[in-house]
């Protein structure tokens, strides 16, 4: 017997929590059920009892299309799960984010949990990347902040194009959807120039966001986003 419940962080489109009538985070509850991740994502053929959580990112277009979806691999065992998510994301659609009354392209960080036990399979979805401080404060099912991707972000022109680099940017995100005090942690490759780092800080501070939500309320949170080439 195969059971595949789909657990949404947002109960329904009508019940989606917002700080105002003109703001809504992107969510998986797309009206056409055959285009949802829950319909398209297939559980990989794996033997035995398993529990795997994949941390993923995607650019959610204003039309709900998922673009550039990728997941972090901890080891080779994660590969079939990463491939399954990538395959489903190519066809899936999401309800796009709404900021200031307009649908906007956003950077989404989410997790997918695959559980197989006693021949039963479940796939759970979390609209947050699982940062410890936010999970401790708001639980596993909070909806993390989502950053609007601008057309001409400063870092695109200021940062290296060829030499590989990657870093994390950590900032405070208020319930009003404003980011403050970004700090940068270098993670791999070359260390970008200060011009690049300042451009990234400028991008974070000047961007629009949907705030983090917990129990239907906009709340302050830690916002962390990876940057790389």
Language-model features, listed with the residues they occupy:
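Hydrophobic h-region of N-terminal signal peptides that target proteins for export
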Residues: 10-19
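Charge-biased low-complexity segments
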Residues: 18-229
């Amino acid at each position: 017997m195969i059971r595949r419940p789909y657990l949404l962080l947002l109960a329904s489109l009508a019940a989606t929590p917002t700080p105002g009538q003109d703001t809504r985070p992107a969510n998986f509850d797309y009206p056409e059920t055959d285009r949802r991740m829950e319909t398209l994502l297939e559980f990989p053929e794996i033997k035995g009892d398993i529990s795997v959580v994949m941390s993923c990112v995607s650019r959610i277009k204003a039309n709900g299309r998922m673009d550039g979806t990728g997941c972090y691999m901890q080891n080779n065992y994660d590969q079939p799960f990463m491939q399954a998510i990538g395959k489903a994301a190519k066809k899936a659609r999401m309800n796009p984010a709404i900021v200031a009354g307009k649908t906007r392209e956003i950077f989404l960080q989410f997790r997918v949990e695959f559980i197989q036990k006693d021949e039963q399979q479940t796939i759970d979805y979390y609209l947050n990347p699982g940062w410890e401080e936010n999970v401790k404060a708001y639980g596993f099912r909070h909806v993390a902040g989502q950053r609007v991707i601008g057309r001409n972000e400063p870092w695109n022109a200021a940062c290296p194009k060829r030499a590989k680099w990657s870093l994390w940017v950590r900032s405070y995100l208020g319930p009003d959807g404003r980011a403050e005090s970004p700090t940068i942690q270098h993670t791999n490759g070359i260390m970008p120039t200060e011009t690049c780092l300042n451009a990234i800080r400028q991008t974070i501070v000047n961007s629009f966001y949907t705030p983090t939500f917990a129990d239907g309320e906009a709340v302050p949170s830690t916002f962390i986003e990876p940057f790389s080439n």
